[in-house]
Design a protein with these regions (language model features):
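Noncatalytic, typically N-terminal accessory segments of nucleic acid-processing enzymes
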Residues: 1-306
């Protein structure tokens, strides 16, 4: 009001913008927030892919646990929970023979900043299943459509994998992040808490870049982030630029036969003029926790910056 009174704000110009004149465009007709369905557009337009043959094996692999489950690395059509964990163990061991492995899962807190988004994604009509290691494994869509079932599954996977890695006595680290604030590390048959990686945030999207940064601080020179999430991509670009990382950080999907990976260094170098503005651009045009304005999407926002 003060700025208006001294003619620092032109009201006529201000009300040309949708956010000022039509705040209801942030919401659907039923009152729910309007979350974007196409946030990956910004990643597809900006990422720089390179041949996987030109990249050496990593020192560290950071795996998005939720993405791994959605990708169904190994999901038995019929079987028990243990069968699923057997397949996940095989996948993790494909990295841990030559690299430290950080496996990061989402946490499911009530009334968190992500609650609305998760509620919109799940089917509230599906009942929760009670899971156990030797109990029957529900279908993938059933598990992944219930937060309660998914949380049980994550807890079982995290505990069972840590126990198995302890018996194998790998020389490389296996660090799993699940419900507890402090991740658990297993190495040389010993388990310990990684207090330095403590986090109270519920989103793996935030935790993954944090753990990448921790690995870089330990002088790791090559890091693979096995994840296809747009939020993670943008956060990695942001941290690479602002923290001036010198290590090689690459993103790849969950299939072993992919011929290309996304190079964060090359992406930042190509788009360094707009990297400082990407997080704000992404947020204002809609992300997991921020509704988007009608007809103002990623492409339109990027065209304003480029």
């Amino acid at each position: 009001m003060y700025l208006i009174s001294i003619d620092r704000i032109d009201l006529e110009r201000l009300f040309q913008f949708e956010l000022a004149s039509k705040p209801a465009s942030l919401f659907k007709e039923n009152g729910e927030a309007r979350y974007t369905k196409s946030k990956s557009v910004i990643q597809r337009k900006l990422k720089v892919d390179v041949s996987s043959r030109t990249v050496s094996k990593p020192d560290v692999a950071v795996i998005d646990g939720g993405g791994m489950l959605h990708a169904a690395i190994y999901w038995p059509t019929e079987g028990i929970v243990k069968d699923l964990i057997d397949g996940i163990e095989k996948y993790v061991c494909s990295f841990i023979n030559f690299a430290d492995v950080y496996l990061v899962f989402d946490r499911y807190f009530e009334f968190s900043i992500k609650s609305d988004t998760r509620t919109e994604r799940i089917n509230s009509l599906l009942r929760a299943h009670t899971l156990s290691l030797e109990g029957p494994l529900p279908r993938k869509d059933t598990c992944m459509s219930s937060n309660e079932t998914k949380e049980q599954l994550i807890n079982i996977i995290s505990k069972e994998l840590s126990d198995r890695m302890r018996t194998k006595k790998f020389t490389h680290k296996f660090v799993v992040t699940s419900k507890q604030p402090v991740p658990v590390e297993t190495q040389y048959g010993q388990m310990s808490e990684r207090v330095d990686l403590k986090s109270d945030y519920d989103e793996a999207d935030y935790i993954i870049p944090q753990q990448v940064n921790a690995a870089i601080n330990e002088n790791c020179q090559s890091i693979f982030v096995i994840c296809i999430d747009t939020d993670v991509f943008l956060l990695l670009c942001h941290h690479f630029f602002t923290r001036k990382w010198t290590s090689n950080v690459n993103m790849k999907d969950f299939t072993s036969d992919t011929t290309t990976i996304t190079c964060i260094r090359s992406t930042v170098e190509r788009h360094q003029a707009i990297i400082p503005y990407l997080l704000a651009c992404h947020s204002l045009t809609g992300c997991d926790t921020v509704p988007n304005l009608h007809n103002i999407g990623k492409s339109k926002a990027l065209s304003c910056h480029q």
